[in-house]
């Protein structure tokens, strides 16, 4: 959501080209990008889409939730039960993000968002940066204030 400004900013890069560029140009990321490229091709085949047409980030993430292909294949869900796990359908995206977080340790009925809490750690699995996890938690806290003040 944050990376795409909640769907307002659209992807600028071919996911295939982004991953392939990493395979051939970035030795430290080559193995990872090769696996992600394979996962992209699996996703494209399953969804019957052209892998060259999927747009995403410079790093190869796509959709409103900015999933990398392996995470999308493993953890996306068809929340609205229309037969498609759609990275550009908010019902599927929010359901998939929730599933991703719970699969990565986000506890049920959680109210502890402190540094290094289980919720914080599950957010950090998405982007292995303390600053990123802190920013998401801060955003959550500000959003909660606005939501609860409106009632």
Task: Identify the role of each PLM range.
Residues 1-151:
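Catalytic glycan-binding domains that act on GlcNAc-containing polysaccharides
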